Swiss-Prot record:
Protein's gene: ruvA
NCBIfam families, per database record: ruvA
One example of a Gene Ontology biological process annotation: DNA repair
Annotated stretches, region: Domain I: 1-61
Function: The RuvA-RuvB-RuvC complex processes Holliday junction (HJ) DNA during genetic recombination and DNA repair, while the RuvA-RuvB complex plays an important role in the rescue of blocked DNA replication forks via replication fork reversal (RFR). RuvA specifically binds to HJ cruciform DNA, conferring on it an open structure. The RuvB hexamer acts as an ATP-dependent pump, pulling dsDNA into and through the RuvAB complex. HJ branch migration allows RuvC to scan DNA until it finds its consensus sequence, where it cleaves and resolves the cruciform DNA.
Protein name as it appears in the record: Holliday junction branch migration complex subunit RuvA
One Pfam family of this chain: RuvA_C
Assembly and oligomerization: Homotetramer. Forms an RuvA(8)-RuvB(12)-Holliday junction (HJ) complex. HJ DNA is sandwiched between 2 RuvA tetramers; dsDNA enters through RuvA and exits via RuvB. An RuvB hexamer assembles on each DNA strand where it exits the tetramer. Each RuvB hexamer is contacted by two RuvA subunits (via domain III) on 2 adjacent RuvB subunits; this complex drives branch migration. In the full resolvosome a probable DNA-RuvA(4)-RuvB(12)-RuvC(2) complex forms which resolves the HJ.
Amino acid sequence: MYEYFEGIIQAVTPAYIVIDVHGIGFRLLVANPYHFEAGEQKRVYVQLIIRDNDQTLYGFEGAADKRTFNQLLTVTGIGPKSALAILANVSSGGLATAIAQDDVKFLTKFPGIGKKTAAQIILDLKGKITTDGQPAAAAIAPVASDVDSELADALAALVALGYPQRTVDGLTDTLKAFSAKTTDAYLREGLRLLSGKA
């Protein structure tokens, strides 16, 4: 029904943004709200999901993420919230690489994704997830072998999110000193450091 909205970002919250299009404010659930800035002119790709009596608009920074979102919805066990949570943690290209490599362990890092659902994602979407119309070619970069598996997984996730390998490598010692117990804790700290919020 809608391909994209173009207008002024009026509000940014932890879960959604509001975009003003010719005086009408649309609330869009997005993967990473803080990638948007209030007051900026922005084109946001959208997908309307209608379920029962509920109509929800989902927003995306690019057409590739919108395509990936809709492809994820074709997988048994994946709903809009799960699809958005995946996109909040990995780029379309990173997801394509994980699927191409049958990386169940990587996929199970996403909220609500167990081994069974991860295997289903690989089965249903292998060779289908694309970036700008072409299968993603970038591999998930290997990380140093002298870090524990939780930290290594977090560093790989940061690269998959699109951060430069050199930048991520520069966080290794800082995150090692952080001594977190889980991949999620390392990932959150890495994102905090990369965002410049001390």
